[in-house]
Amino acid sequence: MYISNLRLQNFRNIHAKSFDFKNSINFIVGKNGSGKTSILESIYFLSHSRSFRSSQLNRIINHNADEFIIYTKAYNPDEITISLSRKKNSNNISKLNLEIQKNHTEITRNLPIQLINPESFNIINSGAQQRCKVLDWGAFYLDKTFLKIWQQTKFLVKQRNSALKQNYPYSYILSIDKKLCEFAEILDYKRQAYFTKLKPKIYEILSHFNPNLQLDIDYFRGWNLHKSLAQVLEESFNYDNKYKVTNHGPHKADIVLSVSHKPIQDIFSRGQQKLLICALKLAQGEIHNSENDNKCIYLIDDITSELDSIHTLTLFNYLKQLKSQVFITTTEKNKINEFIDTNSYILEI
């Protein structure tokens, strides 16, 4: 997949502009407030039907307008068009090849995105839910049945929590547990299948950044490895019932990062943590590209302020090997001069 043209109308501070891009590394250069990150945000929005910058979607619409429109022409390898519009206090309207979509799933499948921005580096210090999203992103593209299993599992956990809060009888909780255990086992299997591919790839890429970094990467499924979920839920019922929430299950899954059984945030410097996240994101893209004809697109926001020049060069070289389309923003052109080659494209705004 690569985007050849992007048109924005009333998207943040961009009133009406059209941008052409190359199927290579695209540098977007401009001062703060010029709209660089808004271009990345619009591409991300097309893929995910949401922003990575704000949950207040009405604020994305230009203050002089009532609606924003994002339109792109892309190749996968055949030409496709994707558009998304949103009016104030209304829902998103998504179109794939001019056909309105009932949900955004097919567009997300057609437009796989990996984002690296300053907030990405908080994955290590965030809760398990953020790290579990790494697994779910990969499993979604690896296995077309994953989404339905994930949705059903999420529904059952929510249903169980609601039943606990409303003091439903234990027999009713057990009826939910039976279904939850069935779907949780399948979800765990699919996550484990992706993690098995991801773990060695992270190690491989991280060695390019810093061969001296040592860490352990483990998958925690959300409950005791040596017990069935049914047994764990039964044993923890009194505790769950006391606090009115389900404390064990696939919603508690995590990627555990440690060094000699100590959390890496206690061992790794901030710079080393950033290298690990870059390796993680690159690993996800490489696995995706090897399993799909539809290559992953990278959105990288102001990376030169996050990594030193040596590690930035390592990142760029690896991105070139992936042969994915890449969008990189920067405030200063001189920061990227050493990374530009004949295949690069520079957009100054």
Swiss-Prot record:
GO cellular component terms, semicolon-separated: cytoplasm
Q: Name one Pfam family in it.
A: SMC_N
Main location group: cytoplasm
Q: Where in the cell is it found?
A: Cytoplasm
Q: At the top level of its lineage, which domain of life is listed?
A: Bacteria
Keywords annotated in UniProt? ATP-binding, Cytoplasm, DNA damage, DNA repair, DNA replication, DNA-binding, Nucleotide-binding, SOS response
Q: Could you tell me which InterPro entries the record lists for this protein?
A: DNA-binding_RecF, DNA-binding_RecF_CS, P-loop_NTPase, RecF/RecN/SMC_N, RecF_2
Q: Which Gene3D superfamilies does the record associate with it?
A: P-loop containing nucleotide triphosphate hydrolases, RecF/RecN/SMC, N-terminal domain
Binding residue positions for ATP: 30-37
Biological process terms in GO annotation:
DNA replication; DNA synthesis involved in DNA repair; double-strand break repair; SOS response
- Which GO MF term does the entry hold, naming one? single-stranded DNA binding
NCBIfam families for the chain: recf
| Family listed | Belongs to the RecF family.
UniProt function note:
The RecF protein is involved in DNA metabolism; it is required for DNA replication and normal SOS inducibility. RecF binds preferentially to single-stranded, linear DNA. It also seems to bind ATP.
**Name of the molecule in the record:** DNA replication and repair protein RecF
